[in-house]
């Protein structure tokens, strides 16, 4: 992963907050699925297969398949890591998919599958890109290892608490995103997705600017 361009932790923390919003929307407004957190989605799929009330095999399956499609696309995007523009392009692709999701939520307010699919593709794409970047403790969609590291590497556990600030902020970022997403989705599905699109586009522009400044040094 050393050939990948540098990514600002601040940008990835913003993307982590976006994840919280997206999963709040998908779980609360699209039939109890996760389109970003595939660990949770697989668990929900298992519950649905066992006949748990309020869950759907088809919705969870669509989320999983869409995520895989996005991850394949993200893998293709990351094939050429000789420059740094591919990261911004990928983030702009994600922003476009989230904007599409917001539009679909307006056009098909009672049909969640299109929004599940578009947000799933967006999150799969993002995961493939962030995986290639390989920034420690900032996967942007999963916090299990981050929380484990925070505890297992703490002074209480005999460690020296490396990157505890980054780990803590990542947890807070996703928590804040989930809270904000919940507050917004009470009123409309499209608004939080539109906000996510704008934030992600801003992250793409910020990444372009940061790496442009680095090239000029």
Q: Can you describe what each PLM-predicted range is?
A:
Residues 1-217:
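Alpha-helical transmembrane segments of multi-pass membrane proteins
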């Amino acid at each position: 992963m050393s050939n990948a361009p540098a990514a600002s932790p601040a940008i990835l923390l913003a993307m982590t907050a976006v994840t919280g919003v997206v999963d709040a929307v998908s779980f609360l407004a699209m039939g109890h699925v996760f389109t970003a957190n595939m660990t949770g989605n697989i668990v929900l799929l298992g519950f649905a297969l066992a006949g748990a009330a309020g869950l759907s095999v088809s919705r969870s399956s669509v989320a999983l398949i869409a995520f895989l499609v996005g991850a394949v696309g993200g893998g293709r995007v990351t094939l050429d890591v000789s420059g740094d523009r591919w990261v911004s392009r990928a983030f702009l692709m994600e922003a476009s998919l989230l904007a599409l999701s917001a539009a679909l939520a307006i056009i098909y307010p009672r049909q969640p599958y299109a929004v599940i699919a578009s947000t799933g593709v967006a999150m799969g794409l993002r995961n493939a890109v962030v995986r290639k970047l390989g920034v420690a403790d900032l996967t942007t969609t999963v916090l299990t290892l981050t929380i484990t590291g925070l505890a297992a590497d703490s002074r209480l556990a005999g460690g020296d608490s490396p990157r505890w600030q980054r780990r803590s902020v990542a947890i807070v970022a996703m928590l804040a995103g989930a809270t904000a997403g919940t507050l917004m989705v009470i009123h409309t599905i499209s608004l939080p997705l539109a906000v996510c699109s704008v934030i992600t586009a801003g992250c793409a522009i910020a990444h372009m600017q940061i790496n442009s400044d680095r090239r000029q040094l």
